[in-house]
């Protein structure tokens, strides 16, 4: 359906992947509105797998389900994100700290592309940095969701920095 119109889709996680037919209560309420940028059908082990590439646009809250056939259609509302002052000294120190922790994480995670590491080092906004890192490191779903649900960019990067440090210790 997203491919027939403006290619926008609301993405949210299911709380329990074992639930075959999720309803409103089985879904996390905060997700992302994204644009579908590419769809590829690939043969894998004799089956066709659909791989979809998306670009996140903004956070949104799922307020309800308006239709279940042929797929779930939700009523959503965009979330207001707190503004960030780029001159904020604490924010800049937090970014430096997160970059340092990420570099350490990257050294222990050889599967990370050097391009991802370079991208992280180029960020100067805590919210954007947190979103990018969260999308590129191995986090458990509840931890990833917790980062997504934090709308304050400073608090989001603090939360991710703490999670990232915990995962480095656990690995």
Task: Walk through the language-model features, giving the residues of each.
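N-terminal low-complexity, acidic/polar interaction/targeting segments
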Residues: 1-171
């Amino acid at each position: 359906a997203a491919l027939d119109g403006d290619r926008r889709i609301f993405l949210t996680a299911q709380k329990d992947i074992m639930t075959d037919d999720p309803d409103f209560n089985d879904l996390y309420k905060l997700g992302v509105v994204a644009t579908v940028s590419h769809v590829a059908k690939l043969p894998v082990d004799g089956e066709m797998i659909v791989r979809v590439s998306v670009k996140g646009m903004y956070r949104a809250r799922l307020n309800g389900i308006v239709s279940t056939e042929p797929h779930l259609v939700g009523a959503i509302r965009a979330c207001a994100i707190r503004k960030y002052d780029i001159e904020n000294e604490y924010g800049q120190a937090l970014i430096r700290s997160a970059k340092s922790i990420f570099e350490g994480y990257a050294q222990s995670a050889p599967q990370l592309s050097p391009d991802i590491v370079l991208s992280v080092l180029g960020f100067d906004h805590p919210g954007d940095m947190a979103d990018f890192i969260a999308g590129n490191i191995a986090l458990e779903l509840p931890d990833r969701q917790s980062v997504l649900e934090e709308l304050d960019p400073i608090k989001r990067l603090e939360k991710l920095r703490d999670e990232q440090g915990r995962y480095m210790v656990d690995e």
